[in-house]
């Protein structure tokens, strides 16, 4: 099975090109859906890719949304309103919900990802629990493994409980995996979960993604 996903050439400078050329040593382990991305393993990566990822992660600019015209902004506001209604049971506080959706949109678009897919992945990974921790230590909304803070961040895994930081790591890492897999989302999701080539996790994300489907 193969899910095709378009590669964003504009993502964080040259990272997309670098990642597709990356020579990796993949350390894969057995699959367990309950642990979600907690099965993800650290991989060897080229210094240039590590540097580009680190630059993306440490960019401290606030998530200010940019729209090409008023129509795009109106479409975003409609999207946020509908997603907010769907999220009420998971995130009851309106301000928290709106800030979360604002950040999901920003980080997904920044990494060239579909915000609906990111919402589906978060549903599978953490059930929208900000402080979720897997049995092996993956943290936050997107269940980011702490080793990423050492590899491309400042080494502080506690920051993975910060909403924007967690979404930044999760979206950046998934974007890298998509590029590494030449746009094959099925394999990229498997790599994110540590179960490359197995169907259960990618299929779970795809099913959740459909539940967040949105038509403009």
Q: What feature does the model see in each segment?
A:
Residues 59-216:
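Catalytic glycan-binding domains that act on GlcNAc-containing polysaccharides
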Residues 1-85, 90-94, 210-216:
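N-terminal secretory targeting signals
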């Amino acid at each position: 099975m193969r899910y095709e996903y378009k590669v964003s050439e504009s993502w964080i400078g040259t990272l997309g090109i670098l990642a597709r050329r990356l020579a990796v040593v993949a350390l894969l382990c057995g699959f367990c859906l309950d642990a979600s991305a907690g099965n993800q393993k650290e991989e060897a990566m080229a210094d240039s890719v590590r540097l580009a990822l680190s630059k993306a992660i440490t960019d401290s600019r606030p998530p200010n949304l940019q729209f090409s015209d008023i129509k795009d902004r109106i479409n975003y506001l409609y999207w946020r309103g509908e997603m907010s209604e769907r999220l009420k049971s998971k995130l009851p506080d309106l301000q928290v919900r709106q800030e979360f959706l604002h950040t999901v949109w920003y980080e997904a678009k920044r990494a060239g990802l579909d915000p609906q897919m990111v919402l589906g992945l978060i549903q599978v990974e953490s059930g929208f629990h900000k402080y979720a921790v897997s049995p092996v230590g993956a943290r936050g909304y997107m269940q980011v493994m702490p080793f990423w803070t050492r590899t491309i961040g400042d080494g502080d895994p506690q920051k993975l409980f910060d909403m924007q930081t967690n979404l930044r790591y999760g979206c950046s890492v998934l974007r890298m995996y998509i590029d590494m897999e030449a746009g094959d989302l099925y394999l990229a999701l498997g790599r994110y979960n540590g179960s490359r080539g197995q169907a259960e996790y990618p299929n779970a994300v795809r099913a959740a993604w459909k539940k967040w489907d949105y038509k403009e």
